[in-house]
Amino acid sequence: NYMQEPSSSAAATFTDDSIQKCLNPLRSVNHEPPKDCSVYIGVDPALGSNNCVIAATPHEGKLKILFIREDLGLTRNEQILGIVEEAVLQCGRNGSSVSDVIIEAMVFQKGLSRDERLIEMTQRYGFRVREHLTGMNKYDETIGVPSMALSFMRGDIEIPYADDPSTRHQADQLIRQLKAWRPLKRGTKLRQDQVMALWFIWILYRQRKQSFALDTSQFNYKGLPWGSTMPARQVF
């Protein structure tokens, strides 16, 4: 159990209290998505190390994580794309479907997000691919990972935490990374692939939530790390 592990909470971006607010003991990663929902998938791709996929849906005023998948030691882009397709199919139950797949597009991943097989998948399943361009923006207090902490404090993000082995394993891995995350600590020294994949989804969730609450002509999209050239007004 993650709560039994020591941590230096003084400098934590994501505190035990805020994480605790987001745990749902009645939801399992084995449950179907809520009925007729749009699902977002965040992908932090990696060959040789930790490849992470997270699926979440905006539902009942929260961003609800459906499941987290991590694979080690992948050697080919085809394997990553196969995992993405499996995630899309897993989310396509109970009348729900994937609307957006957000993929880190720095360095080698740029080729992945523009792979013909992925483009063919978008045509088959009807989702849009977004390239996420991570740089120093992940430390930004208004759009970076630290800004996601407020959603945890408010309980706006839901982590499944039913008492079954799959759910606890997936949730506890994410929670460990959240508790350990610190600004300006390099990913080579700190595991953060799951935090990154969740952040990709959360940015889109926040962007859409705010655009519904505000007149979009007044909303400032500056700083959003999308590689897409699609105007914001056409996203929704």
Feature roles, as predicted:
Residues N1-E5, A11-I19, E104, I159-S166, ...:
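Short coil/turn segments at secondary-structure boundaries
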Residues N1-Y2, P6, R176-Q218:
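P-loop NTPase motor core of the ASCE superfamily
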Residues S9, E60-W181, A232-F236:
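Mg2+-dependent endonuclease catalytic cores in nucleic-acid-processing enzymes, primarily RNase H-like
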Residues A11, T15, W199-F236:
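Acidic two-metal-ion nuclease catalytic site recognized across multiple nuclease folds
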Residues P33-H59:
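Gly/Thr-rich phosphate-binding beta-strand-loop-beta motif of the actin/hexokinase/Hsp70
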Residues D36, L47-S49, N77, E141, ...:
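Active-site-proximal structural scaffolding
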Residues G48-N50, S96, R208:
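A cross-taxa feature marking solvent-exposed loop/turn segments within ectodomains of secreted
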